[in-house]
């Protein structure tokens, strides 16, 4: 009898959780695709220090954010089936800054979705973060340092044995996507849960005609590589944010 009661309680608890999710609706905002960071290893003399040169390429279209929203939409529908999420794009560049926080974008979201039916209860905000993401193989050359948002680290491998350790070997290209997914209760403005996504990989430049690591991918492939990286990481991170929300 006790076992039967325990099973009933577990079933009711599961039903209650499913009902709570069914009553929730999400607005999703992606703020990672306004620019791409390109980081280079500078020439090194002496002991390794932070010797990273950073440049930024402004992205006039919003393809990275659009595909991020579509990827988030797929995950939400799979993990917490319910009303269709509301996918929002922001074009005010001030929202994209790492230091901007989520206060202003949450108020902006509230105003946009206040008349939506069914009611939007939560916002999922995807923002850039700074992360100690220098590839391990590069730390002998550049020391520590942070990378931000989405982009590429253009690096060099260790030189062949017996050569000057400050002379680089073959170059490589390391795409990265460093972002945070934050779940916010729109009724209170409080953060419910947040998780960081820290994805990167490395591509050798040994097969390029120029030997330049930047030429390892075409411009279109660079963009698609970042989109794929974000999508794969979202599929890992977003379910953690939604769990128990």
Each model region followed by its residue ranges:
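N-terminal segment of the mature soluble domain
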Residues: 41-163, 176-180, 184-190, 194-195
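Bacterial Sec-dependent signal peptides at the C-terminal "C-region" and cleavage site
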Residues: 15-23
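C-terminal/domain-edge helix-coil "capping" segments
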Residues: 22-38, 139-144, 150, 154-245
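Positively charged n-region of N-terminal signal peptides that target proteins for export
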Residues: 1-4
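Short amphipathic alpha-helical segments at helix-loop
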Residues: 14, 53-57, 214, 218
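Bacterial N-terminal signal peptides
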Residues: 6-16
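A broad, low-specificity signal marking well-ordered, structured residues that form hydrophobic/aromatic
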Residues: 14, 26, 124
């Amino acid at each position: 009898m006790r076992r039967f009661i325990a099973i009933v309680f577990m079933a009711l608890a599961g039903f209650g959780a499913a009902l709570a999710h069914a009553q929730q609706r999400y607005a999703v905002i992606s703020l990672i695709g306004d620019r791409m960071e390109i980081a280079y290893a500078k020439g090194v003399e002496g002991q390794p220090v932070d010797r990273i040169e950073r440049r930024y390429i402004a992205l006039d279209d919003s393809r990275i954010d659009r595909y991020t929203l579509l990827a988030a939409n797929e995950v939400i529908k799979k993990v917490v089936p319910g009303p269709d999420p509301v996918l929002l794009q922001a074009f005010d560049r001030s929202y994209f800054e790492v230091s901007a926080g989520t206060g202003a974008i949450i108020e902006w979201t509230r105003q946009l979705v206040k008349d939506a039916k069914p009611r939007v209860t939560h916002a999922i905000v995807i923002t850039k973060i700074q992360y100690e993401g220098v590839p391990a193989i590069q730390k002998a050359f550049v020391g520590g340092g942070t990378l931000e948002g989405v982009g590429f680290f253009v690096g060099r491998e260790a030189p062949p044995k017996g050569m000057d350790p400050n002379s680089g070997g073959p170059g490589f290209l390391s795409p990265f996507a460093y972002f945070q997914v934050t779940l916010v209760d729109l009724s209170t403005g409080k953060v419910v849960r947040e998780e960081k996504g820290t994805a990167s990989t490395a591509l050798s430049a040994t097969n390029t005609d120029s030997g330049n690591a930047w030429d390892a991918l075409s411009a279109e492939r660079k963009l698609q590589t970042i989109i794929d990286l974000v999508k794969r990481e979202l599929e890992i991170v977003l379910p953690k944010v939604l769990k128990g929300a």
